[in-house]
């Protein structure tokens, strides 16, 4: 018997990386997991097939509000309820923080649209169902929302907004709980070409390495399973923010 037997979880952006690791961690505790991606359909289906519990895949792009609504509706239609929403999907590209000319409106708008609007739309659509089950939300944010660092100024702005959203939902929508997991640099397919950053973090972080998706998934599970945790921004950075 797992601690999440009979629960239904939806993890956005879960065809790889933190989302995939979180899907596996949730399923290992007995949850039915809906896996999502905007484009990597085969990878998403492969994640579902590897889960130890019954899962389901739904393709949706969270930068489109109607697709967010359809993703929530599809989850509830398939499993009859929603207990856990993990907002992991996001987007970024590297832009030097000192080069404002390089931070084009297209980059700024896409970063905000996917990371902020998409997460908000998911929370908005999910909230009525989560209130029925007294469920919980975990937003995957970043230490870039706590310190002036990360892949770009726009990314830091977006993740700071999500940290604020997390606290607001926790304060005003109980008994639904809402927490955030704020990783440092994570070794995922998304950051596989950022070798210089991984080397830099490994050199200065007390942990001596970048995070793994599994490190982050463990933090997601802490937020999901600790029934008195709400409004917490949980850093998973190996001590990086202690030295930067």
Question: Could you tell me what each predicted segment is?
Answer:
Residues 68, 96-100, 104-109, 201:
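Substrate-binding pocket helix/loop in short-chain dehydrogenase/reductase
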Residues 8, 15-16:
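Conserved glycine-rich cofactor-binding loop
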């Amino acid at each position: 018997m797992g601690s999440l037997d009979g629960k239904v979880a939806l993890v956005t952006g879960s065809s790889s990386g933190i989302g995939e690791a979180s899907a596996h961690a949730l399923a290992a505790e007995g949850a039915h997991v809906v896996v999502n991606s905007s484009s990597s359909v085969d990878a998403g289906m492969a994640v579902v097939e590897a889960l130890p519990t019954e899962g389901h895949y739904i393709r949706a792009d969270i930068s489109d509000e109607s697709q967010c609504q359809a993703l929530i509706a599809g989850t509830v239609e398939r499993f009859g309820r929603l207990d856990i929403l993990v907002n992991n999907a996001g987007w970024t590209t590297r832009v030097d923080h000192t080069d404002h000319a390089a931070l084009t409106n297209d980059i700024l708008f896409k970063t905000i649209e996917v990371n902020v609007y998409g997460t908000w739309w998911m929370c908005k659509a999910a909230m009525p169902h989560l209130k029925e089950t007294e469920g919980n939300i975990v937003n995957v944010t970043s230490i870039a929302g706590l310190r002036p660092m990360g892949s770009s100024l726009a990314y830091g702005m977006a993740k700071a907004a999500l940290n604020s959203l997390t606290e607001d939902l926790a304060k005003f929508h109980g008994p639904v709980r809402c927490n955030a997991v704020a990783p440092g640099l994570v070794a995922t397919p998304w950051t596989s070409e950022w070798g210089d950053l991984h080397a830099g973090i490994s050199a200065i972080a007390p942990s001596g390495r970048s995070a793994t998706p599994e490190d982050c998934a463990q933090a997601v599970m802490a937020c999901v399973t600790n029934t008195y945790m709400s409004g917490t921004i949980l850093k998973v950075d190996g001590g990086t923010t202690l030295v930067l």
